[in-house]
Structure formats: C-alpha cells, structure tokens
Amino acid sequence: MKIDKYSAILGNTVGYHDMSTLTSHRPVASLPFDGKYRLIDFPLSSLANAGIRSVFGIFQQENISSVFDHIRSGREWGLSTLLSHYYLGIYNTPVENTTVGPEYYQQLLTYLKRSGSNQTVALNCDVLMNIDLNQIFHLHNTIDRPITVVYKKLHLQNISEVNAVLEIDETDHVTEQKLFDGKDPDEVYNMSTDVFIVDTPWLIEKIEEEAKKEYPQKLRYILRDLAVEYNAFAFEYTGYLANIHSVESYYHANLDMLENQKFMKLFSPNQKVYTKVKNEEPTYYSKTSNIKSSQFASGSIVEGTVERSVVSRRVHLHQGSEVRSSLLFPGVVIHENA
C-alpha cells in the first residue's frame, strides 16, 4: 500500500562534535534554541511545511529520552494522524564511529520498504536552517539524477572538520567531495549541508549493497560518496544557516537571533517553525527590571538587568541580578545581586 509520496530520514548530527557538558545528558537535537525551541524543531518543521508525514528518526541509544519527551506524539509537526508515521530507530554504535552495526540498516530498510515513497530526504539537526523542501523536490524531479545535495557557501570559520566540502562544475553537478581541511580564511567553500534528496527505490538498492559489507558505513558517508559517483545535482541554499559544531558556534547562533535580519531569514513567514506546545503564563517583568536587546520565552520572572541575551522558559532573574551577552537555559535562577 502506498503511504506517501515522500519519506524522510532524520539524524542527530553530521559527525561527532565536542559540545562539552551541553550534550552529557541529551543529543545535539534536543539543545534549546532561541528560548522556546529545540534544534530538532527546525528539520521537523521543514518536513511538516513540505507535507511530509512519514519520518524515520535514527539516533544513538545513549541519552535519547529527551527526544522522546520533546516529540511525544508528533502532533505539532503533523505526525499524529492516521495517515502519518513517525518512527525512532536506535543504534548502539558510538557516535564518533564511521561504521555501524547490523541493527542500523535493518531498521532503516524496513522503514523505507514500507513507506512506499518515491523520494526520500535525509537531513540532520546540527545544520540549522529553515529550508523549503518542496522547491528542492521539484528540481530533483526535473533532472536525470537519482540524488540531489544541498550546499551553502561559507567561510572557514563556519565549517568544521566533520563537514564535507564539494567541488561543483559549471552545470551545478558534484564532481568531488572531501572532509573539510581548508586553511584560507578568505576563501568561500561549498559546504555540504548533508541534506540529500534521493529516489527511494535506488536508495534501498544502495543501502542493501552497503549492509552486506563486513563494516558498513553510516548513511551520510554513503550518500556523500554516491553524490560524487552519480554527479548529483547541487542546490545552493541562500537562507540563514548556522553550523552547530561547537559550544562557541551554538552560542553565536543563538545570539544571531537578536539581529533582526538574521531572525527574519530563519523564521520566515512562509516557513513556519513548530515546537512542543506548553501552556505557560507570559513572562513577568517587574518595575526593577531593565531590558535591552534581548529575547524571552514564556513563564519567566525578570526583576534584574538583561542585555543582549536569550532567555529560555521558567527562568527567574532576581532583583539586582545582571545578565549580559548570555544564553540562559530553561529553569535557570540568577540570585539577587549576582
């Protein structure tokens, strides 16, 4: 039975990132962003806006409970109806490994074969963007290639060693890819976002071939190699993008939202971003509060000074407290005169 025209594979990250203690008890996908969101909200919202109602999330087993808690039934992203499907595949291979165990592809192949989809999109949670997937599906269906890849032109400081950079010819097709090792701060690189549109029957065939190997690679490495082998069409993404690969990049991406132009590029009126609904009271600002260039989620109490900061839900800033150029996580308490 045909369930949907499109299906999706959603991963946590494009590679291993040293995020210090931020990811000690949760994956990158569950990290807060801009006060009330989580990083996973953005790829899920891109899928929802494209009408994709069949999603397979594949995450490492460790610290997965926060993903379950946030997504729940998937109602906010249109994944809780009789005709929608959200599955969560769990694997045990360490996140820094490039190879996987047999359960990784067993789950994935079962999902793809049952989806009945024509095309599948693969994407991750650490490349933060709000992309119109309908546009890319349309382009993919007009070209004679089984795979399309999305890239973004970026400078050295915005790319990490786990990202792939692409060589693209004058007809917008991929001729080469390699892990980033750039040294020139003035050069602009074609960084792969690791967003791929692929023909589902073709993808199943390629995954079955990989799964037979003694040490099969993770999906992203297969797709990167296939993009070169089949000269994938390369689609340039020109909207806001933050490559979350370190604590510093995560911090700066949050503070970017204090700049109106960047905020509007990410939160486009035509591409709504959905998140878990919480019925909380509005944030309370006392007479002693002093606010400058900051953003607040709901449910907080502000009695102190806040400048150029992003404040999450249920934060209490006591009288006399001062917060500047900061990102405050949910439930934080800043005491008096701190």
Question: What do the PLM-derived regions correspond to, one by one?
Answer:
Residues 1-255:
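Unchanged
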Residues 1-12, 201, 210-338:
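Left-handed beta-helix
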